[in-house]
């Protein structure tokens, strides 16, 4: 048997982190077992489904490196098949036409609530002859659900779960306008796509009992179900905007690498030893459902940022530089030309050691494209007082005399200057850093000066010396 999983989002908004994790788990499970991972867009809600949301799903999955093994299936294109199955159930006596009016259904609900019973359809038309209905009256098609016994699901994560059939009502398969309901369409699609394992959030668990009834009414084998615990905020409440990023788009814009997000989401609810950083190959090799817990997971943004920093330090410098240049586009006071790009690329080994997100990395690298005169932070301005400017004037002359403006030559020059004037190396490096960046942080000063280039370094020193004060 070929293992076949699917990710089936509704295109009604952004790709939420919970759905992204479900997609990742389905993808890894299929790859681990040498199976297939499929994508289905459940777009039957025409009022809420948009092409923009479809594109967001496709872009998000591609960014995460999650690739389907076949062209995506659009649920709306399969409506004829959904209708065909419902009519087959009708012909087999496993479904029936219900002619109840909206008013009758409302009265039914109100009566149940008044009697403190769950508001369920009471089966008024379950055994009645359709000929009793007024000619041309609208109807829905309902499943004739079993009323005795239990429906049992052997869930691969939650264990054995069961519900008394008496607690379930006869769910609608086709609405009065002939369109299929979500629960019915999903069963038809999963069966026809030969899905062997359905992995989704445990908020779908109650739906599974109803869907199992459709499978059994059609005489179809049920897939294996695995309902994954939800992701909560750090405080244990439902994840919301007040906690921070929620969607893949949010995390991407906030500067997280896809490798880091996938790595984090995998370990959020799945455990395997103490390994913190796992490559995609390792994820595929190790992932299986026996490591998935039942309890909700809590989003830890601090841990994610830490993990992102690890992945950034391992990332290719060209790739990081390209991302930084995109983020700096249009920023006031920053030139984003080839010269700036070359400077950032040269400094990237030092820049990426300090940053935990690409946003932070871009902020730290922006000085490479600053236009003169620079604006200085209060701490930087303090370093550029009388003593600092004296250092700049003196060391500037020695830097101007260098024929090879390499990190090694610069380091030797700064050390020699400090030794000659009997001051600490930091007393030389700190004013230089302030003059170059407008702040007090940068990669190593030798790497920073070399990357900026001799002409730019001397120009920035001159700009400080020419002003009455740093921010004049």
From Swiss-Prot:
The family database entries (CDD domains) matched by this protein are listed as:
GluRS_core (cd00808)
Taxonomically, the superkingdom here is Bacteria
User: Enzyme class, one word?
Assistant: ligase
Q: Where in the cell is it found?
A: Cytoplasm
What HAMAP family is this protein classified in? Answer: Glu_tRNA_synth_type1 (MF_00022)
Identify the residue span(s) of motif 'KMSKS' region.
238-242
Q: Which Gene3D superfamilies match?
A: 1.10.10.350, HUPs
Q: Which species does the entry assign this protein to? A: Gluconobacter oxydans (strain 621H)
EC nos = 6.1.1.17
Q: What's the name of the protein?
A: Glutamate--tRNA ligase 1
Amino acids binding ATP: 241
Q: List the PROSITE patterns.
A: AA_TRNA_LIGASE_I
Supply the alphabetized keyword list. Answer: Aminoacyl-tRNA synthetase, ATP-binding, Cytoplasm, Ligase, Nucleotide-binding, Protein biosynthesis
Which GO BP terms sit in this record?
Answer: glutamyl-tRNA aminoacylation
What is the annotated quaternary arrangement, including any partners?
Monomer.
Q: Return the Basic and acidic residues bias intervals.
A: 112-131
Its family?
Answer: Belongs to the class-I aminoacyl-tRNA synthetase family. Glutamate--tRNA ligase type 1 subfamily.
Q: Which GO terms describe its cellular component?
A: cytosol
Position of sequence motif 'HIGH' region: 9-19
Provide the taxonomic classification.
Bacteria, Pseudomonadati, Pseudomonadota, Alphaproteobacteria, Acetobacterales
């Amino acid at each position: 048997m070929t293992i076949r999983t699917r990710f089936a989002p509704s295109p009604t908004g952004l790709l939420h982190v919970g759905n992204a994790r479900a997609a990742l788990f389905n993808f890894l499970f299929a790859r681990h077992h040498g199976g297939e991972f499929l994508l289905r867009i459940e777009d039957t809600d025409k009022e809420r489904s948009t092409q923009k949301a479809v594109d967001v799903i496709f872009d998000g999955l591609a960014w995460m490196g999650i690739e389907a093994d076949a062209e995506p299936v659009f649920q709306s294109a399969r409506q004829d098949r959904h209708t065909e199955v419902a009519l087959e159930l009708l012909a087999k006596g496993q479904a029936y036409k219900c002619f109840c009016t909206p008013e009758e259904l409302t009265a039914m609900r109100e009566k149940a609530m008044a009697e403190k019973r769950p508001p369920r359809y009471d089966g008024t038309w379950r055994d009645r002859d359709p000929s009793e209905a007024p000619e041309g009256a609208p109807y829905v098609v309902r499943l004739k659900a079993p009323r005795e016994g239990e429906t049992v699901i052997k869930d691969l994560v939650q264990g054995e779960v069961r519900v008394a059939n008496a607690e379930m009502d006869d769910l609608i398969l086709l609405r009065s306008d002939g369109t299929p309901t979500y629960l019915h369409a999903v069963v038809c699609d999963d069966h026809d796509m030969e899905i062997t394992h359905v992995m989704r959030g445990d908020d779908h668990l109650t739906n599974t009992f109803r869907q199992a009834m459709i499978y059994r009414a059609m005489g179809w084998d049920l897939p294996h179900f695995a309902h994954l615990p939800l992701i909560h905020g750090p405080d244990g409440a439902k994840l919301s905007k007040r906690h921070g990023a929620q969607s893949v788009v949010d995390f991407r814009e906030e500067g997280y690498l896809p490798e880091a997000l996938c790595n984090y989401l995998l370990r959020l609810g799945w455990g395997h030893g103490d390994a913190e950083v796992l490559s995609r190959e390792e994820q595929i090799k190790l992932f299986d459902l026996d490591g998935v817990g039942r309890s909700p997971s809590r989003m830890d943004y601090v841990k994610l940022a830490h993990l992102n920093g690890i992945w950034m330090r391992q990332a290719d410098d060209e790739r990081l530089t390209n991302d930084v240049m995109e983020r700096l586009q249009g920023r006031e006071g920053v030139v984003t030309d080839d010269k700036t790009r070359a400077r950032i690329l040269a400094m990237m080994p030092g820049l990426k050691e300090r940053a935990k997100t690409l946003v932070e990395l871009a902020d730290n690298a922006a000085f490479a494209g600053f236009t003169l005169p620079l604006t200085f932070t209060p701490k930087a301005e303090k370093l550029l007082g009388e003593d600092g400017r004296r250092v700049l004037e003196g060391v500037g002359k020695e830097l101007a005399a260098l024929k090879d403006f390499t990190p090694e030559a610069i380091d030797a020059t700064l050390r020699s200057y400090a030794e000659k004037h009997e001051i600490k190396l930091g007393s030389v490096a700190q004013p230089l850093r302030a003059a170059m960046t407008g702040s007090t942080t940068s990669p190593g000063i030798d790497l920073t000066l070399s990357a900026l280039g001799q002409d730019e370094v001397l120009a920035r020193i001159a700009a400080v010396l020419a002003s009455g004060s740093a921010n004049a």
